[in-house]
Amino acid sequence: MVEPIYGGNIGSVARVMMNFGFKNLVMVNPPLTGIDAMKFAIHAKEIVQNAKIFKSFDEMAENFDLLIGTSAEIAGDKNFIRTPISSAKIGNAVNTDGNIGLVFGREDFGLSDKEIEKCDILVTIPTDKTYKSLNLSHSVAVILYELVREKNLRGANLKKMKLANKTERDVMLEKFTELVSVFELGDFRTRLIRKTFKIVTGRSFVSGRECNTLTGVFRRSRELIEKQKKENV
């Protein structure tokens, strides 16, 4: 939860988490008083008490292999940052073995564009366009329901894949960017391609092995292209 405004919502979210079997609550700059949070948590007070607190979004993000952001505000195909998938499509998250964070924004205006850009996936909950925003705890309930539902559907057949960690993903993205830069497309197009690639790989929940394989391909491709360029000079 990023900068939640009301302690009551923190407690309600903790209660929802306990309903669905989740225990690890993380908050960025929560309100100083925790009285309402404990009051609304009912039997989930322990989740509030054990919550991890971070001072900034970036500090929080360093602790996760993959971040799934949430937003009621979506955009068309031209805005890559706010082009989400439906909440019903995040089921693959239960098929991975890694540290995944679900990121919920402020009650009044949600996550900023900069924060969304730092997430690997953006998810939205389909609602009526006349009133798109859900109460924070209701949003959490819908997302957690989808995850638990998918886990129960897969049941004993669920085989978890080792998710690429943050370092592996960052290295892969950097090597991809270096490869794209060889084509001298300009800063704007390079950044756009980089963002697109990050979104695609985020939605794919790439494994560590897949990530390292792609990293090797990008690195070798860049080396060969640069070698060919030098030979043609």
Where do the model's predicted regions map?
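Post-transcriptional modification and biogenesis factors for structured RNAs
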Residues: 1-233
